[in-house]
A protein has these predicted regions:
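Surface-exposed loop and turn segments in beta-propeller and other repeat-based domains
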Residues: 31-33, 75-81, 157-165, 201-215
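C-terminal motif of bacterial Sec signal peptides marking the signal peptidase cleavage site
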Residues: 14-16
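A short helix->beta-strand "capping" segment at the edge of beta-propeller domains
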Residues: 20-38, 68-74
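Short loop/turn segments that connect beta-strands within beta-propeller blades
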Residues: 66-71, 109-113, 148-152, 193-197, ...
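Hydrophobic, well-structured mid-protein blocks that either form specific transmembrane helices
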Residues: 105-162
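Conserved beta-strand positions in repeat-built beta-propeller and related beta-rich domains
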Residues: 53-57, 96-102, 137-141, 181-185, ...
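Beta-rich, blade/repeat-based domains predominating
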Residues: 37-48, 81-92, 121-134, 138, ...
Length: 252
């Protein structure tokens, strides 16, 4: 489990957005679904209408093909105890899975989930998505990395909110030409313009999971999935008992 023993600046939640280009949103819950409380969610995405999830922790890391209605795994990969699995995505016929500090990434066949190869990865693995051309990754800093299918870096982009770097970028999702990113340990999601790294939107997810659902194992918000087939957006968190379909409402 990642720990930061420092006072974390809450820039994304407390900065006043004087810039009219930065829109602020709250959430409307459209529907809710069961989510496995053993899932320390690191990656969440849809591919061809099917939901997938990668989960972390040493000795507990998995990749799962998940039934949305029940939250149960239809197919599952379990990883060696040496690996703390992070973000994942399907891209160009392959499944890509990152690890946190092992500096390794795994590639599987997207259809069968059969193992194909292991790659040396140049940084900590955190979030992972794609824009149809490049893999896009975070590493817990304020940077996002654009890579080809062999993890060769093509571009690095600093993410800023009103000129200030936004650190701890975590799980990523590419939605309608923008990158959505969880900001680790906060209830905030930032919407990023991939061309210049500027934050164009702030999503306040405070209270998404009601306190009545909290258990000692309940952890932070992390997990953004966009189903292109339906246009629906889903959010969850680490060891949460629920996954939510949500809609954005712009704050007045």
């Amino acid at each position: 489990m990642k720990h930061f023993f420092a006072i974390f600046f809450m820039a994304v939640t407390i900065l006043s957005c004087g810039n009219a280009k930065v829109k602020e949103y709250k959430l409307e819950v459209v529907a809710e679904y069961p989510h496995d409380t053993d899932s320390y969610t690191q990656g969440l995405f849809f591919d061809e209408g099917q939901m997938y999830e990668s989960t972390g922790q040493y000795g507990l890391s998995t990749f799962r093909k998940v039934d949305l209605q029940t939250g149960k795994a239809l197919q599952r990969l379990d990883f060696n105890d040496d690996y703390f699995v992070e973000g994942s995505v399907m891209f160009k016929g392959n499944l890509y899975v990152l690890t946190w500090t092992s500096r390794k990434a795994f590639v599987y066949d997207a259809q069968t989930l059969e193992y194909k190869s292991t790659w040396k990865y140049p940084r900590e693995g955190w979030g992972l998505t794609h824009d149809g051309t490049h893999l896009i990754a975070s590493d817990g800093s304020a940077n996002i990395y654009f890579m080809d299918e062999n993890f060769a870096q093509k571009r690095k982009q600093l993410v800023t909110l009103e000129g200030r770097p936004v650190r701890f970028l975590n799980e990523l999702e590419y939605i309608d030409g923008k990158i959505w990113a969880n900001v680790y340990t906060t209830d905030s999601i930032v919407i990023i313009n991939p061309k210049d790294g500027k934050v164009t939107g702030l999503i306040d997810c405070t209270g998404l999971l009601p306190k009545s659902f909290y258990e000692p194992s309940t952890d932070v918000l992390n997990g953004i999935a966009y189903d292109k087939k339906t246009g629906k957006i889903y959010l969850t968190g680490k060891n949460w008992p629920r996954l939510y379909e949500v809609r954005l409402i712009e704050k007045k």
